[in-house]
Amino acid sequence: MSKPLCSTGLRWLWLVVVVLIIDLGSKYLILQNFALGDTVSLFSSLNLHYARNYGAAFSFLADSGGWQRWFFAGIAIGICVILMVMMYRSKATQKLNNIAYALIIGGALGNLFDRLWHGFVVDMIDFYVGDWHFATFNLADSAICIGAALIVLEGFLPKKQA
């Protein structure tokens, strides 16, 4: 017997749409207003810097000849499907897990769109301290990391009694 979607974690799919709009919108603005490698200082320790990532996190496998584009696209699709099944199986009231899953799905879809449309992921956030720069990243990456952190956090919280 099927259950109403609004009673499942899929009720939180609106957050996927919000993440996608913000992520793709920020990437569109970078692509329209920056040349590759351009940098604009926002404030101390934070720049906007247009970079292309042909690999995964920290440009992992970026120089692998192109096959990695499809490999990482497949991983993103698989993760999105698995997390949507998990959202369907969970209750809408399990907010922390469902928010985490929605953030990860939204981020994964944002980067998947880049891979399929451009052949690379658009990165633009350059955080640094002194001369040390963290890897350039984007809002989709941030959503994925926040979602993963929420899943870890949920594991440490006491379970509610049924």
From Swiss-Prot:
Record key words, sorted: Aspartyl protease, Cell inner membrane, Cell membrane, Hydrolase, Membrane, Protease, Transmembrane, Transmembrane helix
Keyword Repeat: no
Enzyme active site: 123, 141
Membrane topology: Multi-pass membrane protein
GO BP: any one term: proteolysis
Compartment(s): Cell inner membrane
Assigned GO CC terms: plasma membrane
Homology family: Belongs to the peptidase A8 family.
Protein's name according to its UniProt entry: Lipoprotein signal peptidase
Organism: Citrobacter koseri (strain ATCC BAA-895 / CDC 4225-83 / SGSC4696)
Upper lineage: Bacteria, Pseudomonadati, Pseudomonadota, Gammaproteobacteria, Enterobacterales
